[in-house]
Amino acid sequence: MLQDIMNTKKIKLHDCHFGSPLCDPSPAPHLLSSAAAAGLSFHPGLVSSAAQHQQHGAGGWLHEEYYAPRSSPPSSLLAQTCVGSNATAFYAAENLPQFDFPALGTAAAAAAKAPFRSSESELYRPVDPLLLRADHSVRTYYVRPQKRDSGERTPLPPPSQQQHQDRIHGLFAGAPTTRLLSGEPKIHSFPPQVAAKPILPAMDAPSLQNQMENQLTRNCIGAATPVTPTGNLAGSGAPSKTRIRWTQDLHERFVDCVNQLGGADKATPKGILKLMNSDGLTIYHIKSHLQKYRIAKYMPASSEGKQLEKRATGNDMQNLDPKTGMQITEALRVQLDVQRRLHEQLEIQRNLQLRIEEQGKRLQKMFEDQLKASRSVMEPQELDDVVAFAAGDGDDDAFDDVDVQLLAVAGSGYDDAGFQSKIS
């Protein structure tokens, strides 16, 4: 009875995680009886994982490790983990490789043997393969299936060496015109330097492709337009200009040719070029120099004179010998010394002038102070004279009053004696 319950849990867990067509979601009695009759022993990790899945729900990662005895071979271990009639059907249903490699195999070798998933299984992640350890133990990981995003693409398998050679073969083979007109070349022909190498580096392929495409473009233009040595097409434009130096002799020859052709107004660049017949001169040089010659000829006399003076001064400076240059330098140094001394004398004179003005202000102030002092001395004497004169006038008035009083007394005495006084 306990074995039947374990088998039922094993079938349910296996169908929930991997959707195997070998297991029926509804535990039928005949399947349980057939499994029990076959005497299949189930992986204990699956039973414990199923219990953990029922305990925590569908939101956890299931992880169980089972270490088999060292005596049991890997084939027996793999047979115990299978559900079905044989191991081949289980591997085909779960898209797992046949674990027939040595015990010390790597994950890369197992992944290389694994078949590529179809579009029907894109909703689930592939189950990690069972890796055999050195001690003949099996480690099994059960991962919860997750739905992929709609925009996520299925990873492509790594390209093999044959595919890489075919791609390089299609990239460099055939003539350029055949590749341009008819698409993919039919005949594979490599240059000698390319044929020497079995596999070309991937980094060199774009540059070689660009070179071949450029050569194809040049060939498609046609043989009627030859390519010039400068790299430009003959009909696309003028070649690059070269600069020359117009020496005095060359300029004199140019002026003679211009005069022979009737002057700067009537002379043409082609006629001047034919008359000069000088190597290295082109029509562009003649045109440029003729334009400058015309501008210099019709310029005003003043500007022309200034240019002549500048040229003469420059020529004189160039023709000076070192001794004359030293003399001129010494004269300039003496002139600077004289100017410096003159400037110092002017500063001294300015300081003296300021001192003289300040001394004049002081003298003016002293004169004003002396005048004020003299006025203050003369004013008290005048006041004394005025006071003395005023005192003399007061004494005369007093004597007159006394006389008047005496006469009044005398008059009153005569009145008392019986005489009428006529004094008023």
Curated annotation (Swiss-Prot):
<dbReference type="InterPro" id="IPR001005">
    <property type="entry name" value="SANT/Myb"/>
</dbReference>
<dbReference type="GO" id="GO:2000024">
    <property type="term" value="P:regulation of leaf development"/>
</dbReference>
<dbReference type="GO" id="GO:0003700">
    <property type="term" value="F:DNA-binding transcription factor activity"/>
</dbReference>
<dbReference type="InterPro" id="IPR017930">
    <property type="entry name" value="Myb_dom"/>
</dbReference>
<feature type="domain" description="HTH myb-type">
    <location>
        <begin position="238"/>
        <end position="298"/>
    </location>
</feature>
<dbReference type="Pfam" id="PF00249">
    <property type="entry name" value="Myb_DNA-binding"/>
</dbReference>
<dbReference type="InterPro" id="IPR006447">
    <property type="entry name" value="Myb_dom_plants"/>
</dbReference>
<comment type="subunit">
    <text>Interacts with SPX1 and SPX2 in the nucleus; these interactions prevent binding to the promoters of target genes, thus regulating negatively leaf inclination in response to phosphate (Pi) starvation.</text>
</comment>
<keyword id="KW-1070">Brassinosteroid signaling pathway</keyword>
<dbReference type="GO" id="GO:0005634">
    <property type="term" value="C:nucleus"/>
</dbReference>
<keyword id="KW-1069">Brassinosteroid biosynthesis</keyword>
<dbReference type="Pfam" id="PF14379">
    <property type="entry name" value="Myb_CC_LHEQLE"/>
</dbReference>
<keyword id="KW-0444">Lipid biosynthesis</keyword>
<dbReference type="GO" id="GO:0045893">
    <property type="term" value="P:positive regulation of DNA-templated transcription"/>
</dbReference>
<dbReference type="GO" id="GO:0009742">
    <property type="term" value="P:brassinosteroid mediated signaling pathway"/>
</dbReference>
<dbReference type="InterPro" id="IPR025756">
    <property type="entry name" value="Myb_CC_LHEQLE"/>
</dbReference>
<feature type="coiled-coil region">
    <location>
        <begin position="326"/>
        <end position="391"/>
    </location>
</feature>
<dbReference type="GO" id="GO:0016132">
    <property type="term" value="P:brassinosteroid biosynthetic process"/>
</dbReference>
<feature type="region of interest" description="Disordered">
    <location>
        <begin position="144"/>
        <end position="165"/>
    </location>
</feature>
<dbReference type="InterPro" id="IPR046955">
    <property type="entry name" value="PHR1-like"/>
</dbReference>
<comment type="function">
    <text>Transcription factor binding to specific DNA sequences of target genes promoters, such as the motif R1BS 5'-NAKATNCN-3' and the motif P1BS 5'-GNATATNC-3' to trigger their expression. Nitrate-induced component involved in modulating phosphate (Pi) response and homeostasis together with PHR2; activates directly the expression of Pi starvation-induced (PSI) genes upon nitrate disponibility, thus triggering the nitrate-induced phosphate response (NIPR) promoting Pi uptake activity.</text>
</comment>
<keyword id="KW-0805">Transcription regulation</keyword>
<protein>
    <recommendedName>
        <fullName>Myb family transcription factor RLI1</fullName>
    </recommendedName>
</protein>
<keyword id="KW-0752">Steroid biosynthesis</keyword>
<keyword id="KW-0539">Nucleus</keyword>
<keyword id="KW-0443">Lipid metabolism</keyword>
<comment type="similarity">
    <text>Belongs to the MYB-CC family.</text>
</comment>
<keyword id="KW-0010">Activator</keyword>
<feature type="DNA-binding region" description="H-T-H motif">
    <location>
        <begin position="269"/>
        <end position="294"/>
    </location>
</feature>
<dbReference type="GO" id="GO:0010167">
    <property type="term" value="P:response to nitrate"/>
</dbReference>
<keyword id="KW-0175">Coiled coil</keyword>
<feature type="short sequence motif" description="LHEQLE">
    <location>
        <begin position="342"/>
        <end position="347"/>
    </location>
</feature>
<dbReference type="GO" id="GO:0042803">
    <property type="term" value="F:protein homodimerization activity"/>
</dbReference>
<keyword id="KW-0238">DNA-binding</keyword>
<dbReference type="InterPro" id="IPR009057">
    <property type="entry name" value="Homeodomain-like_sf"/>
</dbReference>
<dbReference type="GO" id="GO:0051511">
    <property type="term" value="P:negative regulation of unidimensional cell growth"/>
</dbReference>
<dbReference type="GO" id="GO:0016036">
    <property type="term" value="P:cellular response to phosphate starvation"/>
</dbReference>
<dbReference type="GO" id="GO:0010966">
    <property type="term" value="P:regulation of phosphate transport"/>
</dbReference>
<keyword id="KW-0804">Transcription</keyword>
<dbReference type="GO" id="GO:0043565">
    <property type="term" value="F:sequence-specific DNA binding"/>
</dbReference>
